[in-house]
Amino acid sequence: MKARAKEWLMPFFSGFWGRLRRRGGNMSLADITFINMCKDILENGTSTEGEKVRPKWPDGTPAYTIKKFGVVNRYDLSKEFPILTLRRTALKSATDEMLWIWQKKSNNIHDLHSHIWDEWADEDGSIGKAYGYQLGVKHQYKEGMMDQVDRVLYDLKHNPFSRRILTNIYVHQDLHEMNLYPCAYSMTFNVTQKKGERRLTLNAILNQRSQDVLAANNWNVVQYAVLVHMIAQVCDMNVGELVHVIADAHIYDRHIPIIKELIERTPYPAPKFWLNPEVKDFYQFTRNDVRVDDYVTGEQIRDIPIAI
């Protein structure tokens, strides 16, 4: 699998920069990051083929991967919004799911406007004590009872230089009651003061134990970029870096031809991100308060097989 990947990557990268120059050299940094990550996984990753794996394809076949351990991608949100142009990422749907977890703190798919969680829900629509449920659990602090989201907002407003501003939804005592273990499980927020700037800068690290690169990478990056923008706005801060740490970044065997075609495309310039400036309360944001202007992309890839 690895040898075949190297075989086709060589001619691809020899022609990539020529195509880019013909477009004028202006391209999305998020696309560069994505292409380099996929190239690294295919060239230097390891295969799980023949090993015992949990995920299966809908036909029951084991879903093997090429994987890379410890992938770290950095996105400077002050320079551009990290949405792919190689293919379209559904900004409003991604934002809706993020708000379902972080704002509604829900574990019921009936509170979503999409059906992406249907496979993991029970007959009542619940995904168990996962994701939003954990963010909604209140804990006792000296300042009073707060859930994790409210604690983050409180600290950023009252003690922004604290090194303790984070969330964690990988709660071991509740794993047996989760229909799916959290993939993106922790956000750490860190505030800096840049020289010459009055406003503080909000940075964040997203920790993820596992990621299906084709189906979910940019989806998650977009979600948490929006989250950082929203929290920065309600805390009167500028946006800084989003650092994405992935323990197991993988490409499924049936996704390899799709990834191959996708990263052969030439990126377009990054679009402009708009967040409704009138919203000053995190709990008042909706999916309609975000927009990307001048968003030109490659053709959408439909009917991507998903391993369960």
Q: Which residues are covered by each model-predicted region?
A:
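Targeting/processing segments of secretory and organellar proteins
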Residues: 3-4, 10
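Terminal, non-catalytic protein-protein interaction segments that mediate quaternary/complex assembly
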Residues: 20, 24-308
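Accessible peptide chain termini
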Residues: 1-2, 27
